[in-house]
Regions:
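Active-site acidic/histidine proton-transfer and metal-coordination neighborhood
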Residues: 67-71, 82-177, 236, 263
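Acidic/histidine-rich catalytic cores of soluble enzymes
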Residues: 43-44, 73, 134-232
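Acidic-and-aromatic substrate-binding clefts and catalytic sites of carbohydrate-active enzymes
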Residues: 46-58, 78-88, 113-117, 153-159, ...
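Conserved radical SAM core fold
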Residues: 10-13, 79-82, 111-116, 211-214
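Residues at the N-termini of beta-strands
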Residues: 43, 104, 204, 249-250
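Gly/Pro-rich active-site loop or hairpin
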Residues: 14-26, 117-120, 185-248, 257-260, ...
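Non-cysteine beta-strand/loop elements that form the S-adenosyl-L-methionine
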Residues: 4-8, 102-109, 201-212
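N-terminal pre-domain/capping segments
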Residues: 1-104, 123, 141, 172, ...
């Protein structure tokens, strides 16, 4: 398994509704690469807007990633309320991915920010996402890319019931699952058990921890996310189940909110992966 890190938190401001920290996007992206390379990470990913920042400088993108001996592998793609637009956007981003030799596209449903955060299952919305995912997944396969749905808090695909409905209605030839260990736990799902159930359909993994204290950050529960080893996720169980399923792809670490700074979070997680998980 290769160990990766996601870089959007070096570019987006967690204290300003995730707007860009400044206009020096490429400098911030390079700082991310420099730091995670220093810590021994092997692969990187980013949200799809990184492709827009480098749309006129593909060679510059490839060169800066190679400069730090990293491999860019995943572009994170958000659905909107317009499936036709999403499909056309996916085409555009797949061209970028082809040009930089990336092999995974995470997909996520539209996220709401108003309460209630957890809502009843919206079968119609999930089936709509499933149809769109099959279309994008079929296209991804033509590009040599795995399309992976990322269940996420405050979206229509989050709970076990919602994940099951989505997976039952997508083609396993075209659509895979990206399990995020913290979002899974936040949804009340045991992460190793979910890996065991969907092992053969897992195409990508997001690793982050979560504080089990549900009284914390009730105004925005995702602020309970933590570096690896600082919460309650059973990562040994997750890795064991991945091995049992024959998974040998990427384990990508991510953390939305930093206890100190991005570098320190990435360092804590990398040390945990090495010292505790033996990877």
């Amino acid at each position: 398994m290769r160990i990766g890190y996601t870089g959007w938190t070096w570019i987006s401001n967690e204290r300003d509704n995730w707007n860009p920290i400044n206009e020096r996007h490429k400098e911030n992206f390079e700082q991310f690469l420099k730091e995670v390379s220093d810590l021994g990470y092997e692969t990187v990913e980013n949200f799809n807007w990184i492709a827009d920042y480098y749309s006129d400088d593909i060679e510059g993108f490839k060169n800066v990633v190679q400069k730090y001996n990293l491999k860019f592998e995943n572009l994170y793609f958000y659905f909107s309320d317009n499936p036709d637009k999403d499909y056309e956007e996916a085409k555009k981003y797949l061209e970028f991915m082809k040009s930089v030799d990336a092999h995974y596209m995470n997909m996520q449903g539209v996220m709401w920010t108003d309460t209630p955060y957890q809502r009843p299952t919206n079968k119609e919305q999930i089936l709509s996402y499933a149809r769109l995912s099959d279309k994008i997944g079929r296209l991804c396969k033509e590009y040599g890319v795995k399309a992976c749905m990322h269940p996420h808090a405050n979206t229509a695909v989050f709970t076990k019931e919602q994940i099951d409905l989505y997976m039952e209605n997508t083609n396993p030839e075209y659509v895979f699952l990206c399990i995020d260990t913290a979002h899974t736990t936040l949804a009340g799902i045991d992460a190793p058990e979910l890996v065991r159930e969907y092992g053969k359909r897992i195409g990508y993994m997001h690793l982050k921890d979560i504080d089990p204290d549900e009284t914390l950050n009730t105004e925005w529960p995702m602020k309970r996310f933590r570096p690896l080893g600082c919460g309650c996720v059973n990562f040994k169980g997750v890795v064991n189940e991945l091995r049992n399923a024959g998974y040998d792809d990427i384990l990508c670490v991510e953390l939305d909110y930093q206890p100190v700074c991005n570098y320190r979070s990435a360092q804590i997680s990398r040390e945990y992966i090495h010292n505790v998980l033996g990877l």
